[in-house]
């Protein structure tokens, strides 16, 4: 926050060292890795599966906790200013493979920062019914797909009775 408020410029990237690194995922670990490597002179490309950069910073943390345009977008811009390239809608394993990145696109190393893991299910009747969401799915629908709005493609229906299993941050 201090750096943003005082327009402190990031460290400039060193002269390129001629080595290419692929970073899979544009969440906190991917952005950190990409920025640090770029500062050391590596040519870095970040591959993001979703259409928007930021990973859990964008889809998993509500706007009131982490302002997307004030903080996240500015941080991504700072990483871009270091020379990092970004490609969205690239699902590693489907769109391309790690082998292809290394053999056909000449990346010498790959960092996998593919994000939050899959949810744990309880194995109880009804957990796969329509309207039942894991924490990650709920956050993604709300933050990225704007499902809280009725005029969007994937609205979350609002009923009078809701059951929340768990007591973590998402539940609150």
Label for each model-derived stretch:
Residues 1-13, 142-143, 149:
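Ferredoxin-type iron-sulfur electron-transfer modules in oxidoreductases and energy-metabolism complexes
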Residues 20-47, 87-102, 114, 118-120, ...:
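Rossmann-like dinucleotide/flavin-binding elements
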Residues 35-36, 58-59, 122-126:
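Short amphipathic alpha-helical segments
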Residues 42-58:
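Glycine-rich FAD pyrophosphate-binding loop
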Residues 60-88, 127-142:
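N-terminal glycine-rich dinucleotide-binding loop that anchors FAD/FMN and/or NAD(P) in oxidoreductases
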Residues 107-108:
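Local beta-strand N-terminus motif with an aromatic residue
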Residues 111:
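N-terminal Rossmann-like NAD(P) cofactor-binding module of classical short-chain dehydrogenase/reductase
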Residues 114-128, 132-133:
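Flavin (primarily FAD) binding-site architecture
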């Amino acid at each position: 926050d201090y750096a943003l408020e005082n327009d402190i410029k990031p460290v400039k990237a060193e002269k390129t060292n001629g080595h290419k690194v692929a970073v899979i995922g544009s969440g906190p670990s991917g952005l950190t890795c990409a920025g640090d490597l770029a500062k050391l002179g590596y040519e870095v490309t970040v591959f993001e599966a979703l259409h928007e950069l930021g990973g859990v910073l964008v889809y998993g943390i509500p706007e009131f906790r982490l302002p997307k345009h004030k903080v996240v977008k500015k941080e991504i811009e700072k990483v871009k200013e270091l020379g990092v390239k970004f490609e969205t809608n690239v699902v590693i394993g489907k769109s391309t493979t790690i082998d292809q990145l290394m053999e056909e696109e000449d990346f010498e190393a790959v960092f996998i920062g593919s994000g939050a893991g899959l949810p744990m299910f309880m194995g109880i009747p009804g957990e796969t019914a329509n309207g039942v969401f894991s924490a990650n799915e709920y956050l993604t629908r709300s933050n990225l797909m704007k499902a809280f709005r009725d005029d969007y493609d994937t609205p979350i229906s609002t009923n009078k009775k809701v059951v929340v299993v768990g007591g973590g941050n998402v539940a609150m």
